[in-house]
Amino acid sequence: MNYLNRFKQLSDEAAEALQNLVKDMINKNTTNILEVGTYAGQATLRLAGAANEKSNSVRVISIDENHDSFSPTAEESLKASNIFNTSVELGELNKRFEEYIVRANIIYIDRFHNKIDEKMELIKRNVIIPTKVIFRNPKNSDDFPFEVTEVSPQVKPRARKKPPVTETTDDKTIAKETKKETT
């Protein structure tokens, strides 16, 4: 893979660990990986590389608030690496986050560091498929910088319609006619 930018948010070891972690998480049901926080594209390239190695049908959707002034961009690194399974979308981060968490099988969050509890609750309420969430905790980056959580959809019991109450005549007894013969 050709990461063209000199800026590295993750050490080479952490980036390799992220790629291997995601590669191990991808299974036959994985269709979308959501990355929140593109920045310079280092994690984007690793996620797309893991998806590309494991399955041609897995897409990486990378969202961020704005295009940081890093040059070369994530798109340029992806193109140089011949990886085309990724879309990078910018702007309206909160709206896009809510929209895409429903579709993602794997979510990598490298943003919202101060609001992660709030975002995890949003994920738990809205996922419709089992989803693995990887959160990069910059405070923990000396050790293992990733926290992994598996979230399953909340199955809510359906409200059943009660049939309308009608009087039934189950207790009716049929009167027998008896004839007395008189002589």
Predicted stretch roles:
Residues 3-4, 12-154:
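S-adenosylmethionine/decaboxylated-SAM
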Residues 155-164, 173-183:
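Arg/Lys-rich low-complexity patches in intrinsically disordered regions that function as generic
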